[in-house]
């Protein structure tokens, strides 16, 4: 870690200290804040580029607005590291995304300066509008400021909220952090002058006087005058879209120029009417050359060398499940021109950047628009194509109605690739994929698979391409596989059939695993057998349709049956329990059945291994579960590993 010299930042305990600084000191504070952010993320890893892009904006907002009394909401949330440093959390900033440390996103439980938790995009304007209305109903005085950017304006929810806010005429301030200049670039001094002019009280007062005068004119003249004024401002500023939604538009402004930012923010702070949208143009990675040169690579980083920018990546023992999926899909697409791929603004995260390099015309990135992605895939499936819709488990939640109504109800063969299923490590509870088994396996006609290793994923990809009888899904975790050899071409698996991978199918205990918990089951089985138990281990492969024959065989042939899955209650284990109760096996006391699932809590950031241990889903927990069912070891051997 570099020994930084940050004399001005060292005087900042919270945002009140930022407000006490004279304006001519803010540029120095921003420079020191940027250096501190770079150094901290080099130690912990995390989201770097977005935070560097809003350093000046963060300083300006805390200087102008009376936070935390004024509500400041960040969206997506991962650009909040500079905000955390200025709001009393600098002493813990090098615990970002670590067990027991600061969250990588805003979090209500962490600080009063985080009025709303945000890790999924495009929620800020809706939440901010709710806070603004609550303020008005309570007769309070405060500003509500929503900072939205980093692609979040590609999601429909943001426009739904803006439409509502405009119709309600609520006093709400939205800062559009445009960090790819997708709408309009700032044009130097003229742009800054216009932004300052039209955000000021004089212009807004004259505008209101003009409206009152126009109100006494014939309606067609009044409408014409309003359109002319809107056109004139829209011509110079490019904000017509936001004006049509009912927002007063200001900008674009250079988001790295404090002399431009501060007067505009003061003007909108003091405005008595709203809503107002301030369009700020920033650069991701600003002030750190490697991040400026490669915004995509430095969006999210592991630990890195500050001087060179080189990221310290651990050597892989096996390919990631994401890569195995992508390479398998490419292989399948060579033989089937109907295979197409869809992602919602996550091409590199889902591996579809690799597919897109080979088949760009068959790859579709629809933006942060999961609802649209699913129904878009449904339309492709309706016309005979084979769409693979690749989403993180946590983001698939945003499109559940489309999964049910547009896909499952119509029996359309959309293939869902569910990445980051289960616990995800440093991104914590907001990005965990705990619920997909439960909310998919309950749907009629849905097929849900989970591979135990890389080879199984290759086979499941072949199965999905061949399966046209309805929607299907495969879920796999973040991170590397277990290192097994992958077949060149996958085999089509029989739908709804599992396999016994260890044992005879009869004995004291049967462990029935869904997905990658199979390795922990095999580890537990080895220790249980050393202690004198006879153990069968089976890989279910499918949560739905359930392999009834396999489940009933295991239940009939063992004194106890334990299911293991990296998912919430209501998933695979619940379906197994439903079957054995329907068959009356529990009535007769023929078998003891237990389901091992994620606990009914949100599990905070940690390493994945520690999260699994805390969740009670590692080999130690499986052994303990069997010990509780069947008693101590038969052979007098310890069931637990030494050390």
UniProtKB/Swiss-Prot annotation:
<feature type="binding site">
    <location>
        <position position="150"/>
    </location>
    <ligand>
        <name>Mg(2+)</name>
    </ligand>
</feature>
<keyword id="KW-0784">Thiamine biosynthesis</keyword>
<dbReference type="Pfam" id="PF02779">
    <property type="entry name" value="Transket_pyr"/>
</dbReference>
<feature type="binding site">
    <location>
        <begin position="151"/>
        <end position="152"/>
    </location>
    <ligand>
        <name>thiamine diphosphate</name>
    </ligand>
</feature>
<dbReference type="GO" id="GO:0016114">
    <property type="term" value="P:terpenoid biosynthetic process"/>
</dbReference>
<dbReference type="InterPro" id="IPR005475">
    <property type="entry name" value="Transketolase-like_Pyr-bd"/>
</dbReference>
<comment type="similarity">
    <text>Belongs to the transketolase family. DXPS subfamily.</text>
</comment>
<feature type="binding site">
    <location>
        <position position="179"/>
    </location>
    <ligand>
        <name>Mg(2+)</name>
    </ligand>
</feature>
<dbReference type="Pfam" id="PF13292">
    <property type="entry name" value="DXP_synthase_N"/>
</dbReference>
<dbReference type="GO" id="GO:0008661">
    <property type="term" value="F:1-deoxy-D-xylulose-5-phosphate synthase activity"/>
</dbReference>
<dbReference type="InterPro" id="IPR020826">
    <property type="entry name" value="Transketolase_BS"/>
</dbReference>
<dbReference type="InterPro" id="IPR049557">
    <property type="entry name" value="Transketolase_CS"/>
</dbReference>
<dbReference type="InterPro" id="IPR005477">
    <property type="entry name" value="Dxylulose-5-P_synthase"/>
</dbReference>
<keyword id="KW-0460">Magnesium</keyword>
<dbReference type="GO" id="GO:0009228">
    <property type="term" value="P:thiamine biosynthetic process"/>
</dbReference>
<feature type="binding site">
    <location>
        <position position="179"/>
    </location>
    <ligand>
        <name>thiamine diphosphate</name>
    </ligand>
</feature>
<dbReference type="GO" id="GO:0030976">
    <property type="term" value="F:thiamine pyrophosphate binding"/>
</dbReference>
<keyword id="KW-0479">Metal-binding</keyword>
<comment type="pathway">
    <text>Metabolic intermediate biosynthesis; 1-deoxy-D-xylulose 5-phosphate biosynthesis; 1-deoxy-D-xylulose 5-phosphate from D-glyceraldehyde 3-phosphate and pyruvate: step 1/1.</text>
</comment>
<keyword id="KW-0808">Transferase</keyword>
<feature type="binding site">
    <location>
        <position position="370"/>
    </location>
    <ligand>
        <name>thiamine diphosphate</name>
    </ligand>
</feature>
<dbReference type="InterPro" id="IPR009014">
    <property type="entry name" value="Transketo_C/PFOR_II"/>
</dbReference>
<dbReference type="Pfam" id="PF02780">
    <property type="entry name" value="Transketolase_C"/>
</dbReference>
<comment type="function">
    <text>Catalyzes the acyloin condensation reaction between C atoms 2 and 3 of pyruvate and glyceraldehyde 3-phosphate to yield 1-deoxy-D-xylulose-5-phosphate (DXP).</text>
</comment>
<dbReference type="InterPro" id="IPR029061">
    <property type="entry name" value="THDP-binding"/>
</dbReference>
<protein>
    <recommendedName>
        <fullName>1-deoxy-D-xylulose-5-phosphate synthase</fullName>
        <ecNumber>2.2.1.7</ecNumber>
    </recommendedName>
</protein>
<dbReference type="GO" id="GO:0052865">
    <property type="term" value="P:1-deoxy-D-xylulose 5-phosphate biosynthetic process"/>
</dbReference>
<feature type="binding site">
    <location>
        <position position="288"/>
    </location>
    <ligand>
        <name>thiamine diphosphate</name>
    </ligand>
</feature>
<comment type="subunit">
    <text>Homodimer.</text>
</comment>
<feature type="binding site">
    <location>
        <begin position="119"/>
        <end position="121"/>
    </location>
    <ligand>
        <name>thiamine diphosphate</name>
    </ligand>
</feature>
<dbReference type="GO" id="GO:0000287">
    <property type="term" value="F:magnesium ion binding"/>
</dbReference>
<dbReference type="InterPro" id="IPR033248">
    <property type="entry name" value="Transketolase_C"/>
</dbReference>
<keyword id="KW-0414">Isoprene biosynthesis</keyword>
<feature type="binding site">
    <location>
        <position position="78"/>
    </location>
    <ligand>
        <name>thiamine diphosphate</name>
    </ligand>
</feature>
<dbReference type="GO" id="GO:0019682">
    <property type="term" value="P:glyceraldehyde-3-phosphate metabolic process"/>
</dbReference>
<keyword id="KW-0786">Thiamine pyrophosphate</keyword>
């Amino acid at each position: 870690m570099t020994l930084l010299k940050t004399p001005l930042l060292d005087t900042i305990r919270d945002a009140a200290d930022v407000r006490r600084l004279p304006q001519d000191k803010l540029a120095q504070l921003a420079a020191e804040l940027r250096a501190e952010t770079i150094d901290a993320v080099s130690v912990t890893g995390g989201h770097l580029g977005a935070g560097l892009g809003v350093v000046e904006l963060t300083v300006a907002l805390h200087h102008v607005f009376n936070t935390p009394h004024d509500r400041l909401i960040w969206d997506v949330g991962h650009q909040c590291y500079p905000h955390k440093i200025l709001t009393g959390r600098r002493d813990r900033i090098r615990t970002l995304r670590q067990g027991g440390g600061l969250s990588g996103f805003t979090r209500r439980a962490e600080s009063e300066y985080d009025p709303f938790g945000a890790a999924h995009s495009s929620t800020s304007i809706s939440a901010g509008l709710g806070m603004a209305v609550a303020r008005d109903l309570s007769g309070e005085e405060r500003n509500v400021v929503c900072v939205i950017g980093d692609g979040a304006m590609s999601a429909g929810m943001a426009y739904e909220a803006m439409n509502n806010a405009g119709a309600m005429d609520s006093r709400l301030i939205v800062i559009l952090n445009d960090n790819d200049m997708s709408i309009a670039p700032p044009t130097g001094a003229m742009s800054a002058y216009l932004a300052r002019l039209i955000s000021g009280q004089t212009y807004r007062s004259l505008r209101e006087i003009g409206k009152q005068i126009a109100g006494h004119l014939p309606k067609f003249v009044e409408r014409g005058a309003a359109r002319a004024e809107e056109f004139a401002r829209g011509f110079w500023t490019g904000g017509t879209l936001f004006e049509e939604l009912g927002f007063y538009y200001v900008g674009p402004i250079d988001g790295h120029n404090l002399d431009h930012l501060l007067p505009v923010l003061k003007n909108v702070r003091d405005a008595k009417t709203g809503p107002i949208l301030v369009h700020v143009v920033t650069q991701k990675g600003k002030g750190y050359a490697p991040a400026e040169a490669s915004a995509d690579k430095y969006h999210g980083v592991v630990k890195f060398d500050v001087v060179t920018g080189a990221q310290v990546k651990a050597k892989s023992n096996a390919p990631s499940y994401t890569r195995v999926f992508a390479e398998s899909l490419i292989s399948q697409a060579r033989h089937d021109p109907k295979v197409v791929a869809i992602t919602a603004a996550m091409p590199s995260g889902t591996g579809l950047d690799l597919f897109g390099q080979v088949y760009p015309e068959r790859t579709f990135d629809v933006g942060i628009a999961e609802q649209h992605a699913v129904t878009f895939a449904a339309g492709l499936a309706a016309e005979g194509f084979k769409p693979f819709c690749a989403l993180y488990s946590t983001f698939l939640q945003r499109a559940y109605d489309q999964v049910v109504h547009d896909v499952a109800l119509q029996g359309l063969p959309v293939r869902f690739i569910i990445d980051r299923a289960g616990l995800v490590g440093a991104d914590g509870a907001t990005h965990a994929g705990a619920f997909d088994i439960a909310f998919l396996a309950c749907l009629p006609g849905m097929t849900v698979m989970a591979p135990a290793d890389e080879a199984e994923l290759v086979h499941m990809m072949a199965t999905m391409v061949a399966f046209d009888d309805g929607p299907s899904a495969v879920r796999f975790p973040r991170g590397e596989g277990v290192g097994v050899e992958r077949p060149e071409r996958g085999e089509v698996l029989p739908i709804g059939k599992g396999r016994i991978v260890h044992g005879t199918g009869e004995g004291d205990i049967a462990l029935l695993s869904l997905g990658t918990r199979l390795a922990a089951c095999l580890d537990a089985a080895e220790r249980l057998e050393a202690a004198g138990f006879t153990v069968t281990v089976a890989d279910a492969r499918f949560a739905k349709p359930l392999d009834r024959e396999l489940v009933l065989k295991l239940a009939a042939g063992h004194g106890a049956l334990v299911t293991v899955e990296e998912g919430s209650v209501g998933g695979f284990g619940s379906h197994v329990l439903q079957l054995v109760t329907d068959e009356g096996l529990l009535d007769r006391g023929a078998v003891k059945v237990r389901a091992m699932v994620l606990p009914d809590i949100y599990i905070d950031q940690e390493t994945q291994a520690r999260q699994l241990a805390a969740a009670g889903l590692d080999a130690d927990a499986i052994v303990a579960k069997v010990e509780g069912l069947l008693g101590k070891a038969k052979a007098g051997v310890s069931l637990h590993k030494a050390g």
